[in-house]
């Protein structure tokens, strides 16, 4: 690979892969991501996308093999703790928290067992893919345990007699329920992040990062925002603006044949609920339209 091309590592397959691809494409990257290729070249920018296992991404960034990485915070933190124990470099820069990949790392026990608190795990066998995060949490609680390291299907460990509890990622809890387990304690909350190697980039690469970040921030802002149009009574503008979260300096235009109302356009930065629309209507607003925003640059 050309050392002057920006290198971005992302998950090849898994829960972050598709969302990461869509995010990069929405930022204007023209990428041909074929399943049989581990390196993809962005057609319209000097950028290479490396598609790797998610638990390899933090190390690639910390070792400065790649410039940027998109990775779950759970994997990032676990890798950092592991590398600290091995005396390896752990520095990186976090550029942006992303709005997907949300999950939690939780303790779970068999459904029929009573949960009396973390102290009940003293000396027990706990199956996990995240031994360092688990060890740190339990050490803070003064609890020692016997780790059972598994790389997959952690939830079957209690039924298989391998462990008495598990520590695993949870999204909806359906997998735990299907395996006769119940979630009892969240130990870490995670979402996807964009990270950068802790080094000074070539000027050409830094220019690309400087172009990427406003696009990325604009896309994330657009996802959180709605464009709202309505007819509003002039004497209620302040109250209506106060109802719309994040609304600043709405655009107000006169209506052709109504001197008591105006057309009001505003960008609200949070979800507009039905209850809010009902309150707007109660204040005299009409013809209320709520539209998604594809792109935004502040």
UniProtKB/Swiss-Prot annotation:
Cofactor(s) needed for function: Mg(2+)
Regulation: Feedback inhibited by histidine.
Gene Ontology molecular function terms on file: ATP binding; ATP phosphoribosyltransferase activity; magnesium ion binding
A Pfam short name: HisG
Reactions this protein catalyses: 1-(5-phospho-beta-D-ribosyl)-ATP + diphosphate = 5-phospho-alpha-D-ribose 1-diphosphate + ATP
Cysteines engaged in disulfide bonds, as pairs: none
UniProt keyword annotations, A-Z: Amino-acid biosynthesis, ATP-binding, Cytoplasm, Glycosyltransferase, Histidine biosynthesis, Magnesium, Metal-binding, Nucleotide-binding, Transferase
Pathway membership: Amino-acid biosynthesis; L-histidine biosynthesis; L-histidine from 5-phospho-alpha-D-ribose 1-diphosphate: step 1/9
GO cellular component: cytoplasm
InterPro entries: ATP-PRT_HisG_long, ATP_PRibTrfase_cat, ATP_PRibTrfase_CS, ATP_PRibTrfase_HisG, HisG_C, N-reg_PII-like_a/b, N-reg_PII/ATP_PRibTrfase_C
NCBIfam families: hisG (TIGR00070), HisG_C-term (TIGR03455)
Name this polypeptide is given: ATP phosphoribosyltransferase
Source species: Tolumonas auensis (strain DSM 9187 / NBRC 110442 / TA 4)
